[in-house]
Amino acid sequence: MGMSYIEHTSSHYVEMNQNTVDLYLMKNGKPILADGSGYHGNKDMYAVFRDRDPRLYHTVIPPYKVKSGKGDYPTWSYTDNPADREYIDIMGANESCSNPGVGMKRLPGQNWSASLVPEIPRLGTGAFVTCRSGYYVWKNWDNWETSFNNGNLNTADKPIFKIEEVLLNEAEAKFELGVFDQGVADKTINKLRDRAGVVKMVVADINDSFDPNRGKYYPKGNESGILVDPVLWEIRRERIIELMGEGFGIYDIRRWRMAPWFLNKPATGLWMSKELSLIHISEPTRPEPIS
């Protein structure tokens, strides 16, 4: 997953596929396919996001729908469906699309000229804030600037080396040295989980059945792959999630020798039903179908 400095236009071109979304834990610290995870299923985008690691909400725009008002920079109001505001209530309401100045990420979103984005997902081509998978990456999106309504670039800081990477480097190195334990987890990974609002890693609870979809690595000459150690897999998951969208992915995948596991899969998007239209009024062409 790469970086994008343009996140309010049709030139964005950075999105996430379902396989990557599925890597995010539940807030209770369990993988989505684990017993007792509480995963709500993937047949409804609201359900996909419900009770997940909050870092998902800050990386991919959560789903919502509002009613548009009138004017060049329209106001908006809630729909009659309570589900449509679930993630607006979590992220905070973007009360004024013309001059936000209210925080890093608020809903509903707006394009570079502050025009309201009335719903997410926006599937297809030809309009702002659209993508084909339904999972629009907004890692660098910000609503801090009170004069934001005339620009398509983001002003979020881009630190090159930060404490999160230091902690994740230490956790992975300690495992490779054979000394990763609960004490190390508490000083590294659990510092990040506390901040994110995810239940802490308990090393003793992580066994071969902890994640039924655990990844494989591929030593030279081995085409079938070998399951990654379950604890190491959780350390790597934390690195993937915390550093998502910051340019680390391709280097980590190569270093871990896991490219076949990550890349040799169909790139699917959100579950589609016939009731959900792929065509928005502002879009002149029919998009390619999502598998």
Annotate the PLM regions.
Residues M1-S282, R286, S291:
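Acidic/polar-rich alpha-helix caps and helix-coil junctions
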